[in-house]
Amino acid sequence: MQNQRIRIRLKAFDHRLIDQSTAEIVETAKRTGAQVRGPIPLPTRKERFTVLISPHVNKDARDQYEIRTHKRLVDIVEPTEKTVDALMRLDLAAGVDVQISLG
């Protein structure tokens, strides 16, 4: 698997979960002899919602909610066969979305 790269993008609502998952991925890749670049923090997406709390009148009474989507990027340069096998067997937290691309 010479001259290859594995790019892993992680998304989560909880920054503690995503940091824990990236630490597991980096530690697994380094243990199997691959070179790791990252984790690189990508911009956090903030979605804001405004909801009227009054059922009929009083437009001034509103609640505001926010959902933050945290993102990280990890590049694994020149992965070995052991690296790919270890990453496939890795069990990450349920609240983390993982996208893997080969390049």
Curated annotation (Swiss-Prot):
* Gene Ontology MF terms: structural constituent of ribosome; tRNA binding
A Gene Ontology annotation in the biological process aspect, one of them, is: translation
Q: Do you know which InterPro entries this protein is assigned to?
A: Ribosomal_uS10, Ribosomal_uS10_CS, Ribosomal_uS10_dom, Ribosomal_uS10_dom_sf
GO cellular component terms, alphabetically, are:
ribonucleoprotein complex; ribosome
| Pfam families attached to this UniProt entry | Ribosomal_S10
What keywords tag this UniProt record?
Answer: Ribonucleoprotein, Ribosomal protein
The record's SUPFAM superfamilies line, in alphabetical order, gives:
Ribosomal protein S10
The family line of this record is: Belongs to the universal ribosomal protein uS10 family.
- Subunit notes for this chain? Part of the 30S ribosomal subunit.
What is the recorded function of this protein according to its Swiss-Prot or TrEMBL entry? Involved in the binding of tRNA to the ribosomes.
Q: What is this protein called?
A: Small ribosomal subunit protein uS10
Organism taxonomic ancestry: Bacteria, Pseudomonadati, Pseudomonadota, Gammaproteobacteria, Pasteurellales
